[in-house]
Amino acid sequence: MSETIKIDPYGFREYDARWLYPKNINGEGIREVGRGFGTQIIKVKKNARVTVGYDYRSYSEEVKNYFVEGLISTGCNVEDLGLCLSPTIYYSQFDLNSDAVAMITASHNENGWTGIKMGIRKGLTHCYEEMKELKDIVQDLQRYIQ
């Protein structure tokens, strides 16, 4: 790893995750969130196929690349849909029959923010309990690394 992992735990919200990038989360932190999500996915299905996309921000592709590295490290197979809208990612779970989805977006937030909307159950994004589990997994991964 080239830089110290930075993840502000307050970025994990009820239904998604949002941070100022790179102030509150850096690339290594995004990679760890990808590992955490991958860990959740492989508990449901081994060798899962995950569709991933990103929004129009100039740094979103970079964030997506870190996130995908984390997913792949857990054994997930990733299909990158590239620059797209959130509904495209949600629809991909049905049209492409993917096992999980992730969208790199800060939605309506101003430039400087990044975020991740994700889901495993078809047609649904993570709920409070799943986001809490993800936060716990990521924090456990950090303790393991240190």
Which residues are covered by each model-predicted region?
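Gly/Ser-rich phosphate-binding catalytic loop and adjacent alpha/beta segment
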Residues: 2-10, 17-146
